[in-house]
Amino acid sequence: MKKLENEPFAAKYCSNAISLKRSGSSIERISNTLYSSKITMTPHQIDAALFAFKSPTRKGVILADEVGLGKTIEAGIIIAQTWFEKRGKVIIVAPASLMKQWQSELSEKFNLESVILDRKYYNSYAKRGYINPINLIESNIIIVSYQMCSALKDEIRNCRFDLAIIDEAHKLRNVYNEKSITSNNVKYALQSFKKVLLTATPIQNNLLDLYGICSVIDEDIFGDINVFKYNYIKNYDENIEELEHRLKSVMHRTLRSQVQQYIKFTNRIPKTFYFEQNDIETAVYESIRKLLLDSGENSYLIPKSQKHLIVLILCKLMGSSMRAIIYTLKNMRNRLIETKQTGIIEEINLEDYEIDDEEYVESSIIETSAKIDQNQINREIETLTSIIELAESVNEESKYSALLQSLKYSFAHLKKIGAEEKVLIFTESKRTQEFLSERLKRDGYEKVILYNGSNNDANSKEIYNEWIMNHPASSVISKNINMKSAIIDKFRKDGQILIATEAGAEGLNLQFCSLVINYDLPWNPQRVEQRIGRCHRFGQKHDVVVINFINSTNVVEQRIYELLNSKFRLFNEILGSSDTVLGGLEDGKDLERSIVDIYSTCRTNEEINNAFDALQDKYKDNITESIQRTKEELMSNFEEDVQQYFTDILTSAQLCIDETERLLWRLLQSVYGPLIPYDDENFVFEIDGKKYRLSSKNCDNFYESFSLNSKLGERIVEIANSYKYQYGHVVFNISDYKYRLSRIDKLLGKHGYMVLHKVSIDSFEKEEHLVFNAILDDGTRIDQEVCEMLFRLKTTEYITSPFTDSTVRPLLEDSKINIKNVINQSEEKNNKFLSEEIERLNLWADDKIQSVQLEVEQMRIQRKELQQQSDLVSNSIEKENIENQIIKLSKKIKLSWLELADAEEEVENQRKQMISNIRKVNSRESRVEMIFLVSFEIA
């Protein structure tokens, strides 16, 4: 025997055990993903993620947890697991305003990099002549907006994605209507991919919403729309149990009431500060309003390509700060001066205002004019100059004075409730951000930190450099992520006020801050919800105060706040705007456009009020009492007593994570042996001059994180799998193990033989199993669990020659029996999948037949009505026309009955063919590989 320096047999076991491909919805399947992620485990999120893996024959699922329960995290687990299992490609379709948040969440919580595919990114490839640039994107995860997915439907359809995530999937609920162009294009683009739909509102207006959303996953779930209407709308009460049964196979829903044991929900407390503009501020406001109202088609003031966007920005800046207004107006004036000199009409520089909604961003357009009207352009330059001079004469801004009052209230309130004295201020303008920072520092608030999309100011760079010095391992992570971490860390430890812009704050998790100030208020309700959600989220210990400012001299601003507060209920619900309210909003930008129209067309307060009255009526709660009852009745059927179930999930998940951690640490030691220094207490080690720590213990990112998905983790698995040793002798050193293993203690001094096989099964899914068999010299069998426990111990290992057949024959015979049992268990599980799929196909066949029957029945009713009509008609010509219609209809009915028999036969043939195809997929292939066969002793 030759003694080995390391532990290759232990390494081979650990690397195989930690990398096993698992099928179905066992927690073991996602244990590596849970271990490697940076999420706070909640049982309902684990349960939802496992639901997506429950049946390999399904084409997708709907995750319909109530709002605020973390559907993004659930999807993140599914995405990470898809990547882990097969380096799969994933496409995420989300509202444009949520794309960056998705990118941030995947990066920070799952260490997954992604690409946002917007028009600019796509065109950069398309202009170089590439036919389908999507195929060239190196990232495995692509994020697109609904609009972009619709526009690129053919390109996306022709790509190969292993998974499609659709966020806010209720936007597709009208897909059965041909007029819903975007919905149908998205459905077409993603048709062949496995899908996970995320929505808190699977039913919004009526039960057809369910039909539409389910059809995005699979058109055969409910079949014909007329059958759905007949069974589940017209005869709802009789068929509710059947509808519930069908839904439970495809939809998973958790209610807030079910998770209160695990998640503490805090309240939102709205606080409003009113202020009055002074005369000069009012004059500036009215001058800009007049400028917008008077700028016609022939004006040079606003480029046609930016018309909507510039009006939107100017209207919003009127509620922000004078500095932001002055900066934008000067940009507009400089552009006019350049146009006057060159005759070229270029777009306005909008760098101050963070625009990330792609449909507002046009490609750069340069217009040329045959002749510039010098008089008109001079008048417009003079008008801008006069407004700029007026704005520059404002010494003290009334809104800023209100901010000072609010801060005085804020810090007193935070001190009173025992919360950390920290305030988050939001603005949509970088210039307003700079203005607030300067003025607040002047007025005694020294601990002010800025965060925006660039953070290239001196103070931010200083914060970043200081943070990097204390977190050297983070130098390998992207600068944007590190900057975000540095700002959060500084704000948590030393900051008092964080002033953030819209785009910069996406993905910020500030649970330690419980006071949010909207210095200027977005008109998009979803944007407001995202702002407040930075603080009002899981982990928040206090009620969150949300402060808004209202200009009591400005009717438009008052009505905007009224709309957001009363109609969308953003500021005072436990989890913010309810799923019913925001779920019914097709797109927050449609509200923005409506408000821009009011600014652009209404001149008097009466006109403004009338327009807002109409707008409020448009967004009134259109959920009827009847549909609300149906929603509650149907969705409540998903609510069960799940407390013990959730407790069991959490316990099982923690056990799986602990086992993953143990295997990973043992794998590391068995590969490197005494070659590297270890700290077993803190799970720290050093390789090639770098210090690493198990990722589950690396909370402060001071060390490089070590997980199976890290580069080092992949390298170690590769080394372990490269060991060619199959035969040897292993000494398990129980005396070196610091914990007591009672089942192992009994084996001290025993000798025997052990074999490890890997069984690979390829059926609906690929799955792998490790099968241990061990026999002591006295003939005692050792079970799988004890064999696994033995490899927790450090070993001394030797290479030997193969063993004689007579020595290991009983061991190998036992092994054959156990391997056969594993294959049989897999077959039973897959037969269950097969039965479920056959049941679904039978329901589909019934729907098809019923569709023809309903059509015939409808014609019979129509014929009866015509016969009654004929009896009442006295005019012979009219009577003859009706009788001809009856004859035609009777022939059609007779023909339909004949066709029904053919249809039944055709459907039955289709059903048999589909079942045959499923059976072919289920025809399993299995492969058995011996990992090692060793003699052993326990010392």
Place the predicted regions along the sequence by residue.
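SF2 helicase/translocase NTPase motor core
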Residues: 1-50, 54, 71-72, 83-182, ...
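C-terminal accessory region of SF2 helicases/translocases
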Residues: 4-11, 542-704, 709, 713
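Walker A/P-loop
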Residues: 58-78
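Inter-lobe coupling linker of SF2 helicases/translocases
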Residues: 131, 137-138, 142-161, 176-193, ...
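Conserved RecA-like P-loop NTPase helicase motor core
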Residues: 145, 446-557
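Conserved Helicase C-terminal RecA-like lobe
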Residues: 265-277, 313-317, 326-495, 643-693
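P-loop NTPase motor cores of the ASCE clade
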Residues: 337, 365-368, 628, 643-847, ...
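Amphipathic alpha-helical coiled-coil segments
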Residues: 888-908
